[in-house]
A protein has these predicted regions:
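Aromatic- and glycine-rich beta-strand/loop motifs that create alpha-glucan
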Residues: 1-21
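Helix-loop-helix units of permease transmembrane domains in multi-pass membrane transporters
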Residues: 4, 71-108, 270
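Membrane-helix interface segments
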Residues: 15-17, 90-91, 179-183
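Alpha-helical transmembrane segments of multi-pass membrane transporters/translocases
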Residues: 20, 228-273
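Residue-level recognition of transmembrane alpha-helices
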Residues: 21-24, 98-99, 187-188, 250
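Secretory targeting signals
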Residues: 27-71, 96-175, 220-247
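Transmembrane helix segments
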Residues: 29-37, 177-218
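Transmembrane helix-loop junction
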Residues: 74, 87, 122, 175, ...
């Protein structure tokens, strides 16, 4: 616990952490502005509220992974791990603390961002017309007949599951190669290069059914639960008839990545640069 608290304090003493919060607020405000323009003819409070966490979740994922990659790369270059030549258990404890901190950072960014998004939409952009009284309203169509509250719970749990996979991937790359750049490139490729990767996957799946099981298709898990349109796309183009294969992929890749990371982290000969 002391180790985790120490890592937490170190993170929130950094100016870059607070810069990430400011960037998040700026992006959220910009998104709210465009949302207001979109609903000039009439406010759909249910639709707006049901997607209130979308931007915050995406930003939380990106910034918490950047912080994790930076923390791990610094640990191997000038941190405590560098000097723990004969204490693999201590190395594993430090690695675990940083992984746990990544999840805490994700939740903090998600909650703070969502609260900020809601308050600015409620008081600034939509003149108190997007309120919590709509949480029990049913979304009209395309969302499995869910209420707003149920939609928020399901989508955020699915996003959190996918976040576990991304954390495992970042940790693996940082531990094995001791660099944050490659890990961030992989994450950004997964997030920003989705269109290209999915186009190639759709083509490959039409030729070889096993091609759909590559790691960059794991994020489809959140798409499967996000909406009816998303589920239909996953089924029709990527040939996942249900979520079982996606769950197995998510768990399998995450377990393998974490296992390799801990083994390498415990056995690596760490040299002083």
């Amino acid at each position: 616990m002391k180790l985790f608290i120490n890592e937490f304090i170190k993170d929130y003493k950094k100016k870059t952490t607070w810069l990430y919060f400011l960037l998040s607020f700026g992006i959220i405000l910009l998104n709210s502005y465009f949302a207001k323009r979109q609903f000039e003819d009439g406010i759909d409070a249910v639709k707006i509220l049901s997607g209130i966490t979308v931007v915050s979740a995406a930003l939380a994922l990106v910034f918490s992974l950047i912080m994790l990659a930076n923390n791990l790369s610094q640990e191997y270059s000038k941190g405590t791990i560098k000097f723990l030549y004969t204490k693999p258990k201590s190395r594993s404890a430090i690695l675990t603390a940083k992984i746990v901190l990544a999840f805490i950072n994700y939740i903090i960014f998600l909650v703070v961002g969502t609260v900020f998004d809601f308050l600015t939409k409620y008081y600034v952009f939509f003149d108190r017309k997007v309120g919590l009284n709509h949480l029990n309203d049913t979304i009209e169509e395309g969302y499995f007949g869910r209420t707003v509250a149920k939609q928020l719970i399901i989508t955020n749990l699915a996003d959190l599951a996918v976040f576990i996979f991304f954390v495992a991937m970042v940790v693996l790359v940082c531990v094995v190669f001791k660099t944050q750049i490659l890990s961030l490139v992989l994450v950004m490729l997964s997030l920003l290069g989705t269109g290209l990767i999915q186009s190639l996957t759709i083509f490959a799946v039409s030729k070889f059914s096993w091609a759909k099981y590559h790691m960059f298709d794991v994020p489809l898990f959140s798409s499967y639960y996000a909406s009816e349109a998303g589920r239909n796309t996953v089924k029709e183009f990527f040939k996942f008839d249900n979520a079982n294969a996606l769950i197995i992929m998510l768990v399998a890749y995450s377990v393998v990545f974490f296992t390799i990371s801990y083994i390498v982290n415990a056995r690596r000969d760490i040299t002083i640069d």
